[in-house]
């Protein structure tokens, strides 16, 4: 059973939220908290699930700040998640382009979907991992215009998406081996899931397409009329992404986005 299952419904959810509030005012080691829960009669499985989630929320503060205390995570999902400050920049692109309903394909725990929904856009979040789908559903629980779908992005029919009112896509292809995006990185974009060429081809049907790629992507894989942007947060290179012309007001080419606590700087590549 997934460690998420016990906390995604009553009484697990209420227990998680009450303990989160208590820890904010009365911090204590999570190991001690787990022992106290079991001693009070809480089932071991539920106690473990709650403590695991509280630990993930603590770790997630580096990427999501205080918002993390209201979110649900998986270990793999947190590792792969877009930092909230970067996801906010993605969401701003979609809103500025006039998009109204964005499909977040390969959404993971929903960092980008959350930022998109937070700007008032409808979002369809799709992931093949049941744990990730459960997490993103919890994370989007306050947004009426958000929908979560469990499914393989490789099976997506973009014409059907367009028929559902989707007018923009953000994709995060799986770039690691293993069922849970395990250990080994896949460097060839045509071996990603879905392949980069497939994602780029979606723009023939839905013109607004953004895709998260490996920062070390070879320039040969970047379409001449798309915009590639590398993002640094606090001096660390954290991601690269490609944007179709409809999502790139800066035009084709390459740039880097430098984000810090009080500084935003964009430098174009010649």
Region roles according to the model:
Residues 236-263:
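Core SAM-dependent methyltransferase catalytic element
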Residues 1-100, 128-167:
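S-adenosyl-L-methionine
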Residues 122-127:
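Conserved SAM-binding motif I beta-strand of class I
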Residues 98-108:
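Conserved class I S-adenosyl-L-methionine
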Residues 109-121:
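Conserved SAM-binding loop of SAM-dependent methyltransferases across substrates and taxa
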Residues 265-269:
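Conserved small/polar residues in nucleotide/adenosyl-binding loops
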Residues 165-240:
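S-adenosylmethionine
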């Amino acid at each position: 059973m997934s460690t998420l299952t016990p906390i995604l419904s009553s009484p697990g959810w209420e227990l998680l939220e009450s303990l989160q509030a208590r820890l904010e005012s009365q911090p204590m080691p999570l190991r001690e908290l787990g022992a106290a829960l079991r001693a009070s009669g809480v089932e071991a499985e539920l106690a473990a699930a709650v403590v695991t989630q509280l630990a993930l929320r603590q770790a997630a503060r580096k990427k999501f700040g205080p918002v993390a205390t209201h979110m649900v995570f998986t270990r793999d999902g947190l590792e792969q998640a877009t930092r909230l400050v970067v996801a906010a920049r993605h969401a701003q692109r979609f809103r500025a382009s006039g998009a109204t309903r964005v499909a977040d394909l390969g959404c993971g725990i929903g960092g980008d979907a959350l930022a998109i929904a937070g700007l008032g856009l409808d979002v369809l979040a799709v992931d093949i991992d049941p744990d990730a789908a459960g997490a993103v559903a919890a994370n989007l629980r306050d947004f009426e215009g958000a929908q979560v779908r469990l499914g393989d992005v490789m099976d997506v029919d973009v014409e059907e998406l367009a028929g559902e009112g989707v007018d923009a896509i953000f994709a995060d292809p799986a770039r690691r081996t293993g069922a849970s995006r395990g250990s080994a990185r896949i460097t060839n974009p045509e071996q990603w899931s879905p392949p980069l060429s497939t994602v780029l081809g979606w723009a023939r049907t839905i013109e607004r397409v953004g895709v998260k790629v490996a920062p070390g992507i070879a320039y040969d894989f970047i379409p001449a009329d798309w915009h590639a942007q590398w993002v640094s947060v606090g001096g660390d290179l954290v991601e690269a992404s490609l944007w179709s012309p409809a999502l790139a007001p800066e035009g084709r080419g390459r740039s880097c986005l430098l984000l810090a606590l009080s500084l935003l700087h964009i430098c174009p590549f010649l």
